[in-house]
Amino acid sequence: MSSGLDLELSFSQSLQGLGLSPQVAHLIWLPLPMLLVLTAAMVGVLVTVWLERKISAAVQQRIGPEYAGALGVLQPMADGLKLLVKEDVIPVRADGLLFTLGPVLVLVPVILSWLIVPFGQNLLISNVGIGIFLWISLSSIQPIGLLMSGYASNNKYSLLGGLRAAAQSISYEIPLALAVLAVVMMSNSLSTVDIVAQQNGAGLLSWNVWRQPVGFLIFWICALAECERLPFDLPEAEEELVAGYQTEYAGMKFALFYLGSYINLVLSSLLVAVLYLGGWGFPIPVEWLAGWLGQSVDAPLVQVITGSVGIVMTVLKAYLLVFLAILLRWTTPRVRIDQLLDLGWKFLLPIALGNLLITAALKLAFPVAFGG
C-alpha cells in the first residue's frame, strides 16, 4: 500500500531547504493544521447551505437562490454577513455567562472533531491513534452546551428545547458508539487511518458497509438525530417551541448554532464515508492503477494521483450522504418525542448491542473476513 503524502514532512523539508532549522519549521507548521480545519469546515458549511437551499427549492418546484452570484452561490455568504451585523442581544433576566458559553460549547467540540478525519494516508491533521475514542468524547460535550443555552435563556420554550436536545443526544449517543465499536473490532484499531486502510484490500468489495449493513444504518440514523435533522428536529420544532433552545439568540451567537449544526452534518457524513465507505480508497485497488500507469505503488506520480483523487473520493462520498440528508428533510414527517426516545432506547440500542455481539462471533468464526 502506498504510504501517501506526508504534508508535515514535505512542508518542513521545503522550509529547511530555504535555510530554516527543523525547530523553526515545526513552529511555523503548528498553527497551519487548525487554520486548514477551520477553512475546510467553513467551505463545507457554505457548500452545504447552498445545496440545501437549491435542493429544497427543487423539491418544492421553486428556483431558490439566483441573484447572489452565479446560481446563488454567494447566498450563504450573504446570510453569514447578515448575522454578523445583527445586534447581539442578551435577555434581561438571562444568565449572561452561561448564555454566552452555551453556543461555544456546541461549536468547539464539533470543530475539534475534524482533527481526526483522514483524507489520505497522511492527509489528516492528527493521527492520535485513538481518534474514534476522541470523537465520541468530544461529541458528548455538545449536550451540555445545548442544555446550558436553554436554561440560561430564562425562557420556557428555550428550556424545553434544551431538555429535548440533551435527552435526544444522550439517547442516540449510545447506539451510535456501539455501532462504531463493531467497526473498531473488525479493524483492531481506534485510528481512523487504520480503519480506512483495513478497507483498501479489494477496492469496493472490501468496504465495511457490506460487512456492517446494520451498523451502517444505525450510525446514519443516530447521526441524523445528533445533527437534529428531520425527522429528528424535536429540539427546535417551530410549531411547538418557536425555535427551541435558540429562541432568545440573535446575531453572532445564533450564527454559532447555525454553524455547529451544518459542520456537524458534514462531519457525520465524512465519518460515515471513513468508517463504512472506504474513505479515500478507490473503488479499484491502487495496485491496478499503478500497473496501468507502468509505475510502482510508491512512485511519486502514483502518490500524487492517489492523494488528489483520495480527497475527491472522500468529499464525494460525504456529499452524497449530505444530499440524502437534505432529501430526507422534505420527505419524512417529524416524529413525536415519545417515538423518538422509543426508537433510540427500545429499538436501536438492542439492535446495536446485538450487532456488536454478532460481529464478535463472526470475528472468531471467520477471522480473515472480519479482521481476526
Swiss-Prot record:
The keyword Translocase applies. One of its GO terms (molecular function) is quinone binding. Its EC number is 7.1.1.-. It is found in: Cellular thylakoid membrane. Its main location: membrane. NDH-1 shuttles electrons from an unknown electron donor, via FMN and iron-sulfur (Fe-S) centers, to quinones in the respiratory and/or the photosynthetic chain. The immediate electron acceptor for the enzyme in this species is believed to be plastoquinone. Couples the redox reaction to proton translocation, and thus conserves the redox energy in a proton gradient. This is NAD(P)H-quinone oxidoreductase subunit 1.
